[in-house]
UniProtKB/Swiss-Prot annotation:
Residues with the Phosphoserine modification: 385, 424
Membrane-side (Cytoplasmic) residue stretches: 1-80, 180-501
Protein species of origin: Mus musculus (Mouse)
Region (Polyphosphoinositide (PIP2)-binding): 182-209
Spans annotated as Disordered: 1-40, 456-501
Name of the gene this protein is made from: Kcnj3
Extracellular side: 106-129, 149-157
Name by which UniProt lists this protein: G protein-activated inward rectifier potassium channel 1
């Protein structure tokens, strides 16, 4: 641990914290006291550092009667002095009331005057006055049974009162003793051994701006299923003009990753990553001077020894959040075990941290980084782009004349107009050609020449077929279906041959 202290003391400036609220006084090795940071004026907190909520319910009116509907919980929630007062008062009143009932029975029967008569049988033997009646009740209620005072069989009203006393005594014992037991076994005192750091810090962790605070468990007994939650209390005004004095926002401390489920054996640092979803997205070191907020921390778990749920609370106001600080290490490896130094539990030291908010950092990064796809900046590049686009339309001029005529139709697929000389573009355009042309173009070799010759044959077949369909006389005049080209005039044959070259 001393080596760690020397290391961090040489690299950073250790900051000592105190709970007196007098401020932070940075100290370094070989340096005297530096300028003291004067904290801002203390403001009203919603939750104290000890977890007590500063809320008082007033003007309840008739709603106060609701407390009597749950009398047991009301007694448990009272302070100890009121519990002890009610406990003593209830037993005193019950004892005096029952002792008075026994004295009334003895008085109405005349046992007080005839108690010393030899052949007279009283209701309760040896009860002469109120003190003796009170002692008889205590002996009966506490089951002491000295045997000097006892009920006789000549007093039926005494037997009925004895039964009533037993039932009433059991009810009072169960109610008051149960209330005291529940109050004594409450895990509130268990929360006294759960520690929170006096300050929260904001610094970089894993390349991200993070809000951090520390929690610890002083006992060796574990907290089962320990879970931590954080609430941000901040005043705001809605777009409709409604003012919310204590708007509660949830701070993500690892709900999606399970980091909020704690194994609280040694002190842990709880982290809230400040990102676009965080309420602190636009919080910077400069804006913290004017911001007013309170971070409420709630730690819940099951006490291992009693099995009861325990909850510990604390809060951090804006003046208790240190920008650019980190917690001092408290765990060191000893021989055979890990040692926790709680004297450095609240200590922090300064680390390099950008004073900007996450929003400002992202904006600066966006402005400084080049674009992934730069825009065309000069006229030459724009001219080349236009030529490339025009070339797609000029590809049709390289087709045979018959295909050029076909592509001139308005209903012809536009994909054929963009046939390219590349293999990929050819394959893309072949889907719109006739099946015969697709099979020809798929044959390796001089595909262009084969395509032209086969196209000529395909175009001449309909002409031959049309001649074959003529009457025999006309077919004879035309020279048969297979010699139609030979019977054409020379000028037409030349024009027809030029169309396919």
């Amino acid at each position: 641990m001393s080596a760690l202290r020397r290391k961090f003391g040489d690299d950073y400036q250790v900051v000592t914290t105190s709970s007196s609220g007098s401020g932070l006084q940075p100290q370094g090795p070989g340096q005297g006291p530096q300028q003291q940071l004067v904290p801002k004026k203390k403001r009203q907190r919603f939750v104290d550092k000890n977890g007590r909520c500063n809320v008082q319910h007033g003007n309840l009116g008739s709603e106060t009667s609701r407390y009597l509907s749950d009398l047991f919980t009301t007694l448990v929630d009272l302070k100890w002095r009121w519990n002890l007062f009610i406990f003593i008062l209830t037993y005193t009143v019950a004892w005096l009331f029952m002792a008075s009932m026994w004295w009334v029975i003895a008085y109405t029967r005349g046992d007080l005057n005839k108690a010393h008569v030899g052949n007279y049988t009283p209701c309760v033997a040896n009860v002469y006055n109120f003190p003796s009646a009170f002692l008889f009740f205590i002996e009966t209620e506490a089951t002491i049974g000295y045997g000097y005072r006892y009920i006789t069989d000549k007093c039926p009203e005494g037997i009925i009162l004895f039964l009533f006393q037993s039932i009433l005594g059991s009810i009072v014992d169960a109610f008051l003793i149960g209330c005291m037991f529940i109050k004594m076994s409450q895990p509130k005192k268990r929360a006294e051994t759960l520690m929170f750091s006096e300050h929260a810090v904001i610094s970089m962790r894993d390349g991200k701006l993070t809000l951090m605070f520390r929690v610890g468990n002083l006992r060796n007994s574990h907290m089962v299923s320990a879970q931590i939650r954080c609430k941000l209390l901040k005043s705001r005004q809605t777009p409709e003009g409604e003012f919310l004095p204590l708007d509660q926002l949830e701070l993500d401390v690892g709900f999606s990753t399970g980091a909020d489920q704690l194994f609280l054996v040694s002190p842990l640092t709880i982290c809230h990553v400040i990102d676009a979803k965080s309420p602190f997205y636009d919080l910077s070191q400069r804006s913290m001077q004017t911001e007013q907020f309170e971070v409420v921390v709630i730690l819940e778990g099951i006490v291992e020894t009693t099995g009861m749920t325990c909850q510990a609370r604390t809060s951090y106001t804006e003046d208790e959040v240190l920008w650019g600080h980190r917690f001092f290490p408290v765990i060191s490896l000893e021989e055979g075990f890990f040692k926790v130094d709680y004297s450095q539990f609240h200590a922090t030291f300064e680390v390099p941290t950008p004073p900007y908010s996450v929003k400002e950092q992202e904006e600066m990064l966006l402005m400084s980084s080049p674009l992934i796809a730069p825009a065309i900046t000069n006229s030459k590049e724009r001219h080349n782009s236009v030529e490339c686009l025009d070339g797609l339309d000029d590809i049709s001029t390289k087709l045979p004349s018959k295909l050029q005529k076909i592509t001139g139709r308005e209903d012809f697929p536009k994909k054929l107009l963009r046939m390219s000389s590349t293999t990929s573009e050819k394959a893309y355009s072949l889907g719109d050609l006739p099946m015969k042309l697709q099979r020809i173009s798929s044959v390796p070799g001089n595909s262009e020449e084969k395509l032209v010759s086969k196209t000529t044959k395909m175009l001449s077949d309909p002409m031959s077929q049309s001649v074959a369909d003529l009457p025999p006389k006309l077919q004879k005049m035309a020279g048969g279906p297979t010699r139609m080209e030979g019977n054409l005039p020379a000028k037409l044959r030349k024009m027809n041959s030029d169309r396919f070259t």
